[in-house]
Amino acid sequence: FIDNQNNFGSQSYKGELGKIGTYKFSKLEELNQINFKPLFFSNNIVFFDKKGSIIKYDENQKVKWKKNHYSKAEKKLHPKLNFISHGENILVSDTIAKYYSINGNTGELNWSKNNTYPFNSEIKKHKNKFFVIDYKNTLRCYKIEDGSECWNLQTEDSFTISNSKYSLIIIGDMVVFSNSIGDITAVDIESGLIIWQLPTQSSSIINESYN
């Protein structure tokens, strides 16, 4: 499975596709623009539907539990969810600025918090912390235990909202991430201080893009 450096490792593929089962859930909006992955959790699969309900399927494609931790108004926003497992718990971030932790065995809520802006990256974790980027090009570090913020680092903002997820990896004691204008930034994983930053576009190209 994918690691903290977005590396899937070596894969073996024989060129054959075989149907092994069907997983049913309500149709997601804007399916062609979705870049979200199911979570493989203890021989089970965890995914979400268009109202933000989290569904856990067993290896026989049967629903083990289905839980929704959104209000009626939030469900109408069709939140899209990112997952990462941590022991028996699952950490979740979404596209309507919520992030929370649930028990992976029952689906019950451990804690839930709100960010100022929606999230637009996968979740990465390191020891007792996890990391995610929001639409304001801000990398945020939270405690896994209760979701409290350890630190945040805002990089240069843009005038548009990206349809593509920002990249985020962990290398040793660094968190390396990209933002909507193409800057790549490495920060210290404990303090959140910038170690180095690499712009991938000249300022003239960026200005032309938004004029």
Residue spans for each PLM region:
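Aromatic (tryptophan-biased) beta-strands that constitute blades/sheets of beta-rich domains
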Residues: F1-I34, D58, K62-K75, E108-N115, ...
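Repeat-blade elements of multi-bladed beta-propeller folds
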Residues: L31-K51, K76-K98, K113, Y117-L139, ...
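Conserved blade-register residue in beta-propeller folds
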Residues: K56-Y57, S101, C141, A186
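Inter-blade boundary loops/turns of WD-repeat beta-propellers
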Residues: D58-E59, G104, I144, I189
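A structural signal for beta-strand and strand-to-loop patches characteristic of beta-rich domains
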Residues: K98, G107-E108
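Surface loops at the rim/top face of extracytoplasmic beta-rich domains
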Residues: D183-D188, Q197-P199
